[in-house]
Amino acid sequence: MSSSSYFVNPAFFPTYPHAGEQFYATPSGSYELSSCAFSKNPKTSSYSSSSSPSLVATSKPPCTQQLGAATFYGGGTLSNFSTTAGYGDHSTTSAGYGSMSQPISPTSAWDSRMAATYNSASWGSTAAELGDGSYRGRVSALTAGTGCLVSAAAEPNNNHCSQVMSPCKSTSGYPWMPVSGPNVGLEVGRKRCRQTYTRYQTLELEKEFHFNRYLTRRRRIELSHLLGLTERQIKIWFQNRRMKYKKESKNKEEGGSGEGEGENESESTGTENAQPQSAVHGVTILEKPSSLVLHVDDTVGLNAVRHT
């Protein structure tokens, strides 16, 4: 394919046939075209009316457009490729729309069709309009389904497209997104372990807490050098120890107040249940809210009762 656009080169600008120029039958039973869209020859190729799937070309010059050799991802090289070819049997057809110098394997048929579509005349305008300078760069696209990176690179000399498929990698779009997969533990940073203190460190910290519940910055630095701990670890230990001390003191206060209240309640209930009794000279007086009852012994006379 030349570097000039199809507006300059008349070969890329198709000439449409007139309304009267249609297919017409020949005495031999074949059908011929009235004119070719990409050639100046009036009659170029014919089609056989037989049931054979292969295409038969007449002795007339074929209607083909010479394009640059294209190298495909699946393998194989295509030369003398027509702008309207691509639907026949590549392995058996040797004439007709175009000829192939090397057959393409069936496994790479889809790749070759895609590459042929890029090199066809329908897409030739895009490559020609962009020019060699702007079409040399790589075009990268991330497919939505699998995340495979497809890059199409164009060489400046022969302007053929080669598709390079990179291996699919299921990577997250942003670094802060969670990583899913079998190797999650290896990629994610190791979780911070809980700090364990030795008996010596705990004893020194307890002694310091007994004298000072709050440490100054200077004393905290001294303890960090003495015990081999960081200032942050010492600060957190003192915070936890103060919370523990507050909880213990609160429980003690609740326990002491509960015992005192229990003793007072027992005393009050005992006094309420006990009935006040008073004996004066052998007379027992039972106090009741409704009336006063006197029990007089037989040995005591009425004088004693009057005296009371």
Swiss-Prot record:
DNA-binding region listed in the record: 190-249
TM segment ranges: none
Record key words, sorted: Developmental protein, DNA-binding, Homeobox, Nucleus
GO CC, alphabetical: nucleus
An annotated GO BP: regulation of transcription by RNA polymerase II
Domain of life: Eukaryota
Subcellular location: Nucleus
Predominant subcellular localization, coarse grouping: nucleus
Keyword Nucleus: yes
UniProt xrefs under SMART domains: HOX
Ranges for region Disordered: 247-280
GO molecular function: DNA-binding transcription factor activity, RNA polymerase II-specific; RNA polymerase II cis-regulatory region sequence-specific DNA binding
Pfam families assigned: Homeodomain (PF00046)
Placement of sequence motif Antp-type hexapeptide: 173-178
Family membership: Belongs to the Antp homeobox family.
Name recorded for this polypeptide: Homeobox protein HB1
Natural source organism: Strongylocentrotus purpuratus (Purple sea urchin)
